[in-house]
Amino acid sequence: MSSEVDPILAPPNMAVFCDYENVAIGVRDAKYDAFDISLVLEQLLNKGKIVVKKAYADWDRYRPAKRPMHEAAFELIEIPHVSYSGKNSADIRMVVDALDLCYTKSHLEIFVIMSGDSDFSPLVSKLCENNKQVIGVG
């Protein structure tokens, strides 16, 4: 008997992309105490296996968040405030990274976009064209 998991029974692989600055602003504006990434990840694990986690922000401005995000095994992508050409720098980087993984990592079936922005409609359309499921959080 083989010890390999039947691919039909295996949970789908998932990639999570977090626009942390946008999420933090949403939490602040909603007057929540804090943002707890572990609660979000707990819910996402009901949908599949998380194999990629990337979070985008000017991490010097969000130092207290670095530790919990590291502990949750996120790759922290630095988007320096001085290089902002507008509020879309993190958005553009997220889109590029998501499409890169869409086209190069066929084992990824679910893409999670964590952001309060509605700017991601073209990305969602492109992911769906490539037979990917998309979950929006924010």
Locations of the language-model features?
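Non-catalytic, usually N-terminal nucleic-acid engagement modules in DNA/RNA processing proteins
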Residues: I113
